[in-house]
């Protein structure tokens, strides 16, 4: 089985419980978001935790790095998990990340986005 590279942006208690269970059967290596510029050809899972106030500086730095290095994810295949403390921003931030990573060369096949808002009300909605 091919190695999965986890790119974690932010932390939340719910995401910390979810990731070990979701990734238990996969070989996983974690890559700091600051090192994303040298990631070509990998299978990526972006795990983003957003507090009630919106994206933090690490998320913005990740987007800027991807935009400054337009081919850095060439040959990558990705998926995105966004966990939000509130009801706002999760879908918008996920779309922003997918678009920016796609422009940097990462493919997102199928339905690559899983988002959870604070109340998990949106879990019956497919993005």
For every predicted segment, state its role.
Residues 1-127:
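FMN-binding flavodoxin-like domain, especially the glycine-rich phosphate-binding loop
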């Amino acid at each position: 089985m091919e190695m999965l590279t986890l790119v974690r942006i932010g932390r939340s208690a719910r995401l910390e419980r979810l990731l070990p269970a979701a990734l238990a059967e996969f070989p996983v290596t974690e890559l700091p978001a600051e090192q994303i510029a040298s990631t070509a050809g990998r299978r990526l899972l972006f795990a983003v935790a957003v507090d009630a106030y919106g994206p933090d500086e690490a998320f913005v730095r990740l987007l800027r790095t991807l935009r400054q290095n337009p081919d850095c994810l060439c040959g990558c295949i990705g998926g995105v998990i966004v966990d939000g403390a509130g009801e706002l921003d999760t879908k918008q931030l996920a779309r922003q990340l997918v678009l920016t990573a796609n422009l940097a060369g990462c493919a997102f096949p199928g339905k690559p986005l899983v988002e959870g808002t604070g109340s998990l009300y949106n879990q019956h909605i497919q993005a």
